[in-house]
């Protein structure tokens, strides 16, 4: 009934208001109140007293120092397991915000020990617990014990697996040379030997990297690939990481281009604080080929979403300059792919 709805709304507003007062008294961001109430309802204050470090979760994104001060006000011991584990996860997340997908175990232990002013043995015990609980993944990378947040470990594994699946050759049209000639004529220019080879490769490979600095002819190659794919009846979409890059891509190719987020139809879930995408394995992109420009700016999470949205046989052309702006998020993917030597470049 309407009366019941009004009563529930009043209780919710009163609860949020009390929570705002509680957070303000303890010098915590009052804007966290709505999210906390959404999860814990009227028990939110009890939940915070029980484990103040739940606020360090990315869903809340509270400052670690403020949460730590609040926890110590509640007289939680400095070596409390919840504090140690939260400190380790905070350092891992901090590392991600600086572009790294993992942190060596020794470095993570030292950084957390300094953050919490605790002995390394206590931190190592916390790291072991997190690993046993599945809240942190430890793997050997280049002889190091590497520590990951689970979602980044899984993303890295998926991208490696998918890239390897895409490195095989495709059957090229028997009249490929004449198709490339026609593409060249349609652009009214003469391809340099390397440009011609790159355009030919776009017919022979499922995955191709087109790289080079400014003025090296990447735009000519992209336009040539588009002209070739038109003749091969390969439906092609174009995307770039930012609005500005997508606009530039559209202008230089004369085709429609969009941001990767828009192409994948990104949706932000208020409940979880997570980004999701409409296009994935179950709803793949309606194309036979995708050309991505400014790939150096694509981070690990976005590349994972992009690869999930491609049909199994969809071609992928990654274009960019590894010396240009790196991705804001974790993972220097484009440069790593070039360095690996596993992808045709």
Q: What do the predicted segments below correspond to?
A:
Residues 1-345:
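Conserved ATP-binding/catalytic motifs of P-loop helicase motor domains
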């Amino acid at each position: 009934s309407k009366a019941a709805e009004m009563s529930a709304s009043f209780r919710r507003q009163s609860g949020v208001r009390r929570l705002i007062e509680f957070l303000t008294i303890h010098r915590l961001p009052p804007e966290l109140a709505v999210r906390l109430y959404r999860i814990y309802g009227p028990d939110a204050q009890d939940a915070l007293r029980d484990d103040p470090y739940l606020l360090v979760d990315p869903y809340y994104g509270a400052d670690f120092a403020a949460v730590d001060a609040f926890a110590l006000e509640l007289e939680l011991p400095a070596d409390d397991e919840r504090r140690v584990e939260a400190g380790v996860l905070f350092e891992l997340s901090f590392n991600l915000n600086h572009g790294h997908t993992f942190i060596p175990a020794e470095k993570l232990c030292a950084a957390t020990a300094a953050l919490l002013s605790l002995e390394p043995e206590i931190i190592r015990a916390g790291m072991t617990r997190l690993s046993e609980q599945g809240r942190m993944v430890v793997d050997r990378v280049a002889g190091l014990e590497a520590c990951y947040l689970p979602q980044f470990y899984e993303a890295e594994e998926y991208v490696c697996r998918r890239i390897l699946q895409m490195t095989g050759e495709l059957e090229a049209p028997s009249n490929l040379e004449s198709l490339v000639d026609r593409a060249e004529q349609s652009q009214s220019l003469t391809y340099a030997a390397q440009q011609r080879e790159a355009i030919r490769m776009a017919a022979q490979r499922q995955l191709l990297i087109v790289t080079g600095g400014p003025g090296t002819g990447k735009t000519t190659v992209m336009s040539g690939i588009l002209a070739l794919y038109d003749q091969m009846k390969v439906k092609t979409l174009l995307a770039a990481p930012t609005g500005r890059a997508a606009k530039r891509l559209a202008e230089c190719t004369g085709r429609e281009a969009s941001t990767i987020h828009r192409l994948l139809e990104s949706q932000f879930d208020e409940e979880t604080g997570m980004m999701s995408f409409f296009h994935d394995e179950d709803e793949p992109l309606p194309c036979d080929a995708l050309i991505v420009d400014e790939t150096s700016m694509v981070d690990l999470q976005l590349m994972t979403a992009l690869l999930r949205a491609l049909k199994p046989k969809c071609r992928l052309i990654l274009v960019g300059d590894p010396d240009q702006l790196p991705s804001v998020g974790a993972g220097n993917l484009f440069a790593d792919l070039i360095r690996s030597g596993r992808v045709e470049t």
